[in-house]
C-alpha cells in the first residue's frame, strides 16, 4: 500500500498538467490587494495566534493555533471569505474612502445565493448585512436547525433543500438561474470560478498567522471542508515559506 504521507511532488513543482502551470487559474495569493479591500470596508480586528500548552504533553517544541472565534463576532473560521467578495464589489461602487453610511447600502440592488454547511453561509449573510444586499442560504437537511436559525439573525433567508451539500448546491444554482441572483459558492467547477475570490478572503487569516509566528513551522494543519479554505492557505504557505512545512489537510 502506498504511503499517503509522502508527497511525490515534493520540491518538484506541480504535476505536469497545463491547468496547474498557472496557479492563478485555481487560487489567488495576492494578499496585499485582499488586505486593502478588507481593511477599508470590513475593518476586522486581527485574531490572535495562540501558543498552546498542549505542545508539552505531546512532546513537541511548540504548537500554535489561530483563534478565529471572535472575528467579526461570528464564531466562524471563515468570517472573511464571502464577505470579502461583497466588500470588493462595494469598494468598486463607492470607493475605498467611503463612509460606513455609504457602504451599508452600497449593494442594495444585489441578491446573492449559496449553499453551505455553515461557515461560508454565515460569512455571506454577514457580508450582505453590512452592505445592504439580499442573501439566500441553502442548507441541506443534515445541517442542524439551530445553525439555520443563527444565520437568520443576520438578516439572511434560509432554505432547507437536499439530502446533502451537493444537492443543496444544485438547488442554490437553480434558484440563482431562476431569479437572476448571483451564485457565490466557495467552491469551483467547470464554467464557474467565483469561488476563487471567496477563497482569497482566507488569505487574511493565513498572512496574519505566518507574519506573527516567530518560527518556520514544520507542519501546518488545515481543516478540509469542501477544499476552498485549505487550498487557499496551502498555496499561500508555499509562497511564504517555500517547501519547508509539511501541510496536512484534516
Task: For every predicted segment, state its role.
Residues 1-250:
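PLP-dependent amino-acid enzyme catalytic core
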Amino acid at each position: 500500500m502506498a504511503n499517503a504521507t509522502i508527497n511525490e511532488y515534493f520540491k518538484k513543482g506541480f504535476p505536469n498538467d497545463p491547468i496547474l502551470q498557472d496557479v492563478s487559474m485555481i487560487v489567488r495569493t495576492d494578499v496585499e490587494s485582499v488586505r486593502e479591500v478588507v481593511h477599508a470596508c470590513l475593518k476586522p480586528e486581527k485574531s490572535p495566534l495562540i501558543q498552546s500548552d498542549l505542545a508539552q504533553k505531546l512532546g513537541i517544541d511548540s504548537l500554535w493555533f489561530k483563534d478565529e472565534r471572535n472575528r467579526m463576532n461570528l464564531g466562524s473560521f471563515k468570517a472573511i471569505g464571502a464577505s470579502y467578495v461583497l466588500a470588493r464589489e462595494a469598494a468598486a461602487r463607492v470607493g475605498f474612502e467611503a463612509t460606513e453610511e455609504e457602504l451599508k447600502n452600497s449593494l442594495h440592488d444585489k441578491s446573492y445565493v449559496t449553499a453551505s454547511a455553515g461557515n461560508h453561509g454565515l460569512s455571506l449573510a454577514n457580508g450582505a448585512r453590512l452592505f445592504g444586499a439580499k442573501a439566500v442560504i441553502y442548507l441541506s437537511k443534515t445541517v442542524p436547525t439551530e445553525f439555520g436559525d443563527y444565520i437568520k439573525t443576520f438578516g439572511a433567508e434560509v432554505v432547507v433543500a437536499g439530502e446533502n451539500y451537493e444537492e443543496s448546491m444544485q438547488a442554490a444554482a437553480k434558484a440563482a438561474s431562476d431569479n437572476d441572483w448571483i451564485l457565490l459558492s466557495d467552491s469551483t467547477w467547470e464554467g464557474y470560478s467565483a469561488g476563487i475570490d471567496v477563497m482569497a478572503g482566507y488569505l487574511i487569516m493565513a498572512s496574519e498567522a505566518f507574519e506573527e509566528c516567530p518560527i518556520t513551522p514544520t507542519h501546518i494543519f488545515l481543516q478540509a471542508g469542501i477544499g476552498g479554505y485549505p487550498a487557499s492557505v496551502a498555496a499561500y504557505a508555499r509562497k511564504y515559506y517555500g517547501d519547508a512545512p509539511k501541510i496536512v489537510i484534516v
